[in-house]
Design a protein with these regions (language model features):
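Single conserved hydrophobic/aromatic residue that forms the stacking wall/gate
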Residues: 1-16, 20
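Active-site catalytic microenvironments in core metabolic enzymes, especially phosphate/sugar-handling
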Residues: 14-224
Length: 224
């Protein structure tokens, strides 16, 4: 039987984006998307056996002709499309400076910004359209804010060394709550998923505008 060429070899007429890839792949296929842009890709470091659920997802993508593009850390730290930059902008922060080096990249942004803690939380919740969880280790009046989106709660110690009194991230292990209290830092968990929606949305919108194609965001929240 002769199969038609995959859609991805015929040009892209529609794009969709999401933070994760798992069930979103099937949603994108059902929506007849040509290009799926995700933050967390299919493959990570090292060799990986392709079987079970992973095999099914890859096969479904190939059979449908849908291309998948993923960008993890580079998307977190990008100066224009990055999660850190875009979340900061949505909160109302400007003039950030990079901090915390990881494998040659500065993965965080810090800001001099005086604000009451209650007001900052309100601005963050407005930016993500959701609720945050606070470890109230620092003072009510905030002077320096650090941001690393995703699962960077364990970096609260590095943030404290930078003189950051309020650290915003997505999530962290249980011990990071008490660690923040010990360090005298306000640690704000904004949700791993919600804090990483900014970049993929921006890229999809940019591609849609530049190439005049339909783009959409496939929301598949985890609540974490």
């Amino acid at each position: 039987m002769i199969r038609r060429p995959p859609r991805s070899t015929q040009g892209v007429s529609s794009a969709a984006s999401d933070v994760y890839k798992r069930q979103v792949i099937y949603k994108a296929i059902d929506a007849k998307v040509d290009l799926l842009i995700v933050h967390h890709g299919i493959f990570w470091e090292g060799a990986q056996k392709i079987d079970g659920a992973l095999y099914k997802k890859i096969k479904a993508s190939i059979d449908s002709g849908m291309a998948i593009y993923s960008s993890h850390i580079p998307l977190d730290v990008h100066s224009k499309f990055g999660n850190n930059t875009l979340m900061a902008k949505a909160i109302g922060l400007k003039g950030g400076k990079p901090f915390l080096e990881w494998k040659g990249l500065k993965i965080g942004l810090q800001f001099e910004y005086k604000i009451k803690r209650k007001q900052l939380i309100k601005q963050i919740e407005n930016s993500i359209n959701g609720k945050v969880h606070l470890a109230p280790g620092g003072k009510e009046t905030i002077k320096r804010i650090g941001i690393i989106t995703g699962g960077a709660g364990s970096e609260v110690k590095a943030a404290a060394k930078e003189g950051i009194d309020t650290f915003i991230t997505g999530e962290g292990a249980h011990h990071t709550f008490t660690l923040a209290e010990e360090l005298g830092v306000n640690l704000i968990y904004a949700g791993h998923y919600l804090s990483e929606t900014f970049g993929v949305k921006k890229i999809a919108a940019h591609i849609g505008e530049k190439f005049k194609i339909k783009n959409t965001f496939i929301d598949h929240p985890t609540g974490l």
